[in-house]
Swiss-Prot record:
Involved pathway(s): Amino-acid biosynthesis; L-proline biosynthesis; L-glutamate 5-semialdehyde from L-glutamate: step 1/2
Domain of life: Bacteria
Subcellular location: Cytoplasm
NCBIfam families: proB (TIGR01027)
Name used for this protein in its record: Glutamate 5-kinase
Broad enzyme group: transferase
Function text: Catalyzes the transfer of a phosphate group to glutamate to form L-glutamate 5-phosphate.
Length: 379
C-alpha cells in the first residue's frame, strides 16, 4: 500500500558536530533511500535541518550564532548551498525535488494552511519529493516552530502522513542520555497512554549546530501520534533503517498512533494554531468536554493563564497542568478571568454584553484523547 512518509534529519546527522562540515556520505545514503521510497509509489517529504550549520561553515564561523538577525542571515547562505547539494544528488538518480519554506503564522491562518496542503498534494501527484525547512529569514522569534522536530510533526499532521521518521544522533529513545549515563534503558515501543505519562531525563538541548534535543522529539511524538501518525526515532547516519522499520524490524523507538480525526478543521485547531494561553478546568468541566462532547462554559473554569484575545487558540488543562484539549475562545483572557466560575446567564451583567453563551463552542474544541483519557480516569 502506498503511504505518505515524512522524514526529518537533524543537523547532528548531516554535519560533523565539531566543524560543521557536511557528511556527504550520509546525505547520499539518505537521498538513495528516499528515491527508493518514491519509486515504490510512496509520497515522500523530507524536513531537513542544517542550513545554519552549513552557512557557518561556508562563512568560516566557528560557533552557532545567538543573535537572531545573524542566524537568519547565515541560514539564508546555508539553505541555498544545502538545496544545491540535495538537487545534485537527487538529479543523479532522476528524482525531481521541490523546496518548501514555511513559517508558523502561515499555518495559523486557515486559508494558508489549506493552500499548503493543496501544494503538497499537487507535488505528490507530480512525483516530486518536497524538502521542507522553516523560513528562518522572515520568521518571528516568538512565532517560530522552535525546532525542526516540531516542524516535521506539524507537516505530518498537515498532509495526513502515515509515518514520521526522526533521524537523530542516537539509535533510539533511552531513559536518559546514553552518552552520559551508560546504564540508561532503551525504549523500543511507546503507546499513546505511555507517551502521555512519559517523563524521562531526555536532555534539554541538541548539538552545537542544532536546536533539538530528545525532549523536542517527545513533543513532536505527542503532536504526530495525536494526529494519527506513526512515528519512529532511529539513527540518522543509517538512513536504511527507514526501510527496515517499514518492513517490521524492531529498530529504533516506535510511537504508536492514535485514531486520526476525520475533521480537517479540527486538526488545524489542534496542531496548526499556536496556543496563546491556558485555561484550567474543574472536574465537572473536564468530564463534560472530554466524555460528554459539550462546549466549555464559564462555570467550569478555575484559572486563566497568559494574555490572549477572542478567536485565538488556548490550551485546556486539568488542575495539575496536564493539557487535555485545545480550542478557539469566544472571549479574551481578561474577560474570561472576570466570568470564570460563573453561570453563563451572568456573563452579560459582568461584562456588559454577551458575545456567546460558551467560552469555547464544541465545534471549535479538540480533545487530545490520550491525555484526556489518562486524566479523567485517574483515581
Amino acid at each position: 500500500m502506498n503511504q505518505t512518509i515524512v522524514i526529518k534529519i537533524g543537523t547532528s546527522s548531516l554535519t560533523d558536530n565539531e566543524t560543521g562540515q557536511l557528511s556527504l556520505s550520509t546525505i547520499a545514503a539518505l537521498v538513495e533511500v528516499l528515491t527508493r521510497l518514491r519509486a515504490a509509489g510512496h509520497r515522500v517529504v523530507l524536513v531537513s535541518s542544517g542550513a545554519v550549520g552549513v552557512g557557518c561553515r561556508r562563512l568560516g564561523i566557528q560557533e552557532r550564532p545567538k543573535k537572531i538577525a545573524l542566524k537568519q542571515a547565515i541560514a539564508a547562505v546555508g539553505q541555498g548551498r544545502l538545496m544545491r547539494i540535495y538537487d545534485d544528488l537527487f538529479t543523479s538518480l532522476g528524482q525531481p525535488i521541490a523546496q518548501i519554506l514555511l513559517t508558523r503564522p502561515e499555518l495559523m491562518e486557515r486559508t494558508c494552511y489549506v493552500n499548503a496542503y493543496n501544494t503538497f498534494q499537487a507535488l505528490f501527484e507530480l512525483g516530486v519529493i518536497a524538502i521542507v525547512n522553516e523560513n528562518d529569514t522572515v520568521a518571528i522569534d516568538e512565532l517560530k516552530f522552535g525546532d525542526n522536530d516540531t516542524l516535521s510533526a506539524l507537516v505530518a499532521s498537515l498532509i495526513e502522513a502515515d509515518w514520521l521518521f526522526i533521524l537523530t544522533d542516537v539509535d533510539r529513545l533511552y531513559s536518559a542520555d546514553p552518552r552520559l549515563f551508560p546504564e540508561a534503558a532503551a525504549i523500543a515501543r511507546v503507546s499513546p497512554a505511555e507517551l502521555a505519562q512519559l517523563s524521562i531525563d531526555a536532555g534539554s538541548s541538541g548539538s552545537q549546530w542544532g536546536t533539538g534535543g530528545m525532549a523536542t522529539k517527545l513533543a513532536a511524538a505527542r503532536i504526530a501520534t495525536s494526529a494519527g501518525v506513526e512515528m519512529a526515532i532511529t539513527r540518522g547516519r543509517q538512513p536504511g533503517n527507514i526501510l527496515k522499520i517499514m518492513a517490521g524490524e524492531a529498530i529504533g523507538t516506535r510511537f504508536e498512533a492514535q485514531k486520526r480525526s476525520d475533521n480537517a478543521r479540527k486538526r488545524w485547531i489542534a496542531y496548526g494554531l499556536l496556543p496563546m494561553g491556558k485555561i484550567y478546568l474543574d472536574a465537572g468541566a473536564i468530564q463534560a468536554i472530554c466524555q460528554g462532547g459539550k462546549s466549555l462554559l464559564a462555570a467550569g473554569i478555575t484559572k486563566v493563564e497568559g494574555e490572549f484575545s477572542a478567536s485565538e487558540s488556548v490550551q485546556l488543562c486539568d488542575q495539575e497542568g496536564r493539557e487535555l484539549a485545545r480550542g478557539i475562545v469566544n472571549y479574551s483572557s481578561e474577560e474570561i478571568d472576570r466570568v470564570k466560575g460563573q453561570h453563563s446567564e451572568r456573563i452579560a451583567s459582568l461584562l456588559g454584553y454577551m458575545a456567546a453563551e460558551t467560552i469555547i463552542h464544541r465545534d471549535n474544541l479538540v480533545i487530545l484523547s490520550a491525555s484526556s483519557t489518562t486524566s479523567t480516569n485517574k483515581g
